[in-house]
Amino acid sequence: MKVYVIAGRAKSGKNTFGEMLREELKDYGYKPCVMHITEPLYSYAKNYFEWDGNENNKPREFLQKMGIEIIRDKLGKKDFLLNRLYEDIEILSTFFDTFIITDARMIHEFEDIKKHFDDVRIIKLERDHYDDRLSEEEKEHITEKEVDQFEHYDYVIQNRTFDDLKDGALEIVRNEESDII
């Protein structure tokens, strides 16, 4: 089983790229599944805190606080989100052979996923000169800063246009296919 981990700051195109990568992998005969480490946080926001699920009004401050300040720091459950992800992958691996995780941001996440699975590629998306509309506090949060401190990405994709993302997804799939042959 192959696992692709997509990293990047807010609004760098992680979900869009994940969908493009999924489509390219399907064209090569794979059965890919797009997943999110933070799925439990989104579930909490929707089910208990009245978020409507609209990406345009994502409760980023809530997600950051719940994931870091409460779950990791206050409750000491550093691996909570990763463990939930691993359980979901274990269950879903009956139906899928490739997993695309579109929201990794922490060095600990990259390292732990690489330890947990044998065949992992970590991809960073960069979107320079883009107004992400985050508050200064959100921009300074560890989940926005740590992604730039990791130095061992397998691929770095510059997101200037949709074509850049599509070309990057195709290039990665072709590179990975040539490694198999």
Task: Walk through the language-model features, giving the residues of each.
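Conserved lysine of the Walker
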Residues: 14
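P-loop (Walker A) phosphate-binding loop of NTP-binding proteins
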Residues: 8-9
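Extreme N-terminal starter segment of soluble prokaryotic enzymes
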Residues: 1-4
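Hydrophobic positions on the alpha1 helix immediately C-terminal to the Walker A/P-loop
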Residues: 17
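Post-Walker A helix-loop "phosphate-sensing" segment adjacent to the P-loop in P-loop NTPases
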Residues: 23-33
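A short acidic, amphipathic alpha-helical/loop segment
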Residues: 109-115
